[in-house]
């Protein structure tokens, strides 16, 4: 009788240890990229800051110049203001523009500041601008 009770108690202990977690379901914060940034918390890697950043908190927000949409682009500057990293919606790679006088450039991208705020141009066309108040 004691052996039967011991076997039942052991079996009950083993069964109760099953946590019921679903296999393959990621835990919160488990979606770190190769730099350790947690995408689900809004972090992405910035080349110019060499750190995980939340573009919507630390960056300059730019809205589409000619299209009425809520999809914004963000610009983050290096600490010395010599480089500007542009975070465009839907793009995994972020171009890094280098300062040349009062503008930042790389290939077709030009970032400049005027009396109304910031303007990001592509191929000479205004694509993103500072939101108007």
Language-model region placement:
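Positively charged n-region of N-terminal signal peptides that target proteins for export
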Residues: 1-4
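C-terminal motif of bacterial Sec signal peptides marking the signal peptidase cleavage site
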Residues: 14-16
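Bacterial lipoprotein signal-peptidase II cleavage site
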Residues: 18-25
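C-terminal partner/receptor-binding element of secreted or periplasmic proteins
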Residues: 31, 111-133
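Disulfide-braced loops of extracellular cysteine-rich modules
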Residues: 36-40
């Amino acid at each position: 009788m004691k052996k039967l009770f011991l076997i039942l108690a052991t079996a009950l202990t083993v069964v109760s240890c099953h946590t019921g977690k679903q296999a393959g379901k990621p835990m919160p914060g488990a979606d770190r990229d190769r730099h350790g940034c947690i995408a689900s918390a809004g972090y992405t890697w910035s080349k110019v800051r060499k750190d995980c950043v939340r573009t919507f908190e630390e960056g300059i927000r730019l809205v589409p110049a000619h299209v009425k949409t809520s999809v914004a682009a963000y610009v983050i500057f290096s600490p010395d203001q010599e480089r500007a990293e542009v975070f465009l919606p839907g793009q995994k790679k972020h171009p890094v523009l280098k300062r040349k006088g009062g503008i930042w450039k790389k290939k077709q991208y030009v970032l400049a500041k005027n009396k109304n705020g910031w303007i990001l141009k592509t191929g000479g066309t205004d694509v993103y601008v500072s939101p108007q108040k």
